[in-house]
Amino acid sequence: IGNIKGINVLRTEMFLETEYNLKNNIDSKIFYLEAPTGSGKSNTAFNLSFQLLKKSDYCKKIFYVYPFNTLVEQNMNSMEKIFGQKQDIMSNIAVVNSITPYKVKNSSNINLYKNEKYAIEDYQKILLDRQFLNYPIVLSTHITLFDTMFGRSKGSTFGFHQLCHSVIVLDEIQSYNNNKWGAMINFLKAYAQLLDIKIIIMSATLPNLELLTNNNAKAVRLINNREKYFNHRMFANRVKVNYELLNRKIGIAELEEHILQHKNKRILIEFIRKSSAEEFYAYISESAECPVRLITGDSSIQERKDIIADIENMQEVILVATQVIE
């Protein structure tokens, strides 16, 4: 693949390699997928989970699990791009977290706040579907998953039976507390064996969890040679890191001066702290001659979508954001 010119060809190579290795190890319970950022892991995971459903007579449910709500939102948007024209599919996909309205079956867009013409029986069914996770495809965070697995309250146990014969995709596994990695892989392997669960664990920086467990249950790496992708020029040379400013403090005025020197460009400034982002946004908004936008963790889902859609058509814009933009 050294002479590949388009990144999509490289993504397709990985897509097919992982599918091939999955089919050759279809009886395994744990699968690892480690690939560079931007290599199409999400689309690959969609395919792998669907392949597991096709090859099984009893797997009927998929859980896509992420460490942050923003990733849930991002991957739901990806599904809408793929299946958006197929309402019969979208109606079976539900986001289960603390910020998304309860799912109304047989509709991908309607929620309780847009339509009040439901009888009390409808509300009861909608609530029961949510409590018992009665959806073929669930997108959620690890809080929902681990609460269902280990929670002792009545509400936690409602959806427990849905884990049986399911496919679970765990994304960005490195985001979890590394002190818990050993216990996590031990419990995941035990659950996979006892409840017949297929688990795909993926990340761009996947730790070797097999070193932390004495459970000898077979785990399969879906990429034969990770270096083939990580060291390929399409991924390895995308970013040039500049450390010139690392050893000194940069003030708001200096940062503003540097940005204003680059006219007719689309500029992103990312801050760690929300307060810093808001302070700089207020400062540069007074002097910039081009549109300036702000995205932080306080921005609503719809507001983020509107801003991103807005700036996609701009030739010159300054976007001030926190890490939520990633």
PLM features: what roles do these ranges have?
Residues 94-106, 272-275, 292-306, 321-326:
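Conserved helicase motor
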Residues 205-262:
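Interdomain hinge/linker at the junction between the two RecA-like core domains of SF2 helicases
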Residues 27-49:
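Walker A/P-loop
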Residues 61-64, 68-72, 258-285:
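Conserved strand-helix element at the start of the C-terminal RecA-like helicase core
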Residues 86-150:
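Inter-Walker segment of RecA-like/P-loop motor cores
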Residues 1-31:
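ATP-dependent helicase/translocase motor core
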Residues 59-84, 95-101, 208, 274:
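Conserved Walker A/P-loop ATP-binding site and its immediately adjacent core
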Residues 138, 142-146, 156-191:
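SF2 helicase catalytic motif II
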